[in-house]
């Protein structure tokens, strides 16, 4: 029987209590990712340690946030043995709907074989005032559900 397996990508870059991704059989369930750079993650860690207000990403250029979000998503997928082209479905949250065109122009450059099914919506205020957050469901190439063989219900 398939079981839930955390993807070994380290702790959440924000220190929040969640796994960046978990695998169930060949499926990956990827938590919402945003443009957290190592420097921004360090600032979050320092703020939490000192009791200071958490930093905001609002001052970072939107295009930069999108590129960093996609790189973070790539890193998590790679840690599980997958790539962006393995994404089956993505949900994109934008702080401002006016950024949709710029988001789409950048997003499309990260895929080589197909575009995943996708929902894009305006979400109002996102964590750390980021302009974009993306969650995804993907698959790991070469993996099958445990117990799935010829004639089994899972292989049909």
Where are these regions (language model features)?
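N-terminal presequence-like segments and the immediate start of the first folded domain
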Residues: 1-71, 75-89, 94-156
């Amino acid at each position: 029987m398939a079981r839930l397996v955390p993807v070994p990508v380290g702790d959440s870059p924000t220190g929040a209590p969640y796994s960046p991704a978990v695998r169930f059989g060949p499926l990956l369930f990827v938590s919402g990712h945003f443009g957290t750079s190592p420097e921004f993650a360090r600032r979050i860690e320092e703020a939490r340690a000192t009791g200071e207000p958490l930093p905001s990403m609002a001052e970072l250029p939107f295009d930069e946030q999108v590129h960093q979000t996609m790189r973070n998503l790539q890193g998590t997928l790679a840690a599980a043995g997958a790539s962006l082209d393995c994404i089956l479905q993505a949900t994109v949250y934008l702080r401002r709907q006016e950024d949709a065109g710029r988001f789409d122009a950048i997003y499309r450059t990260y895929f080589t074989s197909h575009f995943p099914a996708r929902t894009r919506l305006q979400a109002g205020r996102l964590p750390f005032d980021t302009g974009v957050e993306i969650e995804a469901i993907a698959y790991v190439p070469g993996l099958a559900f445990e117990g799935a063989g010829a004639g089994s219900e899972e292989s049909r």
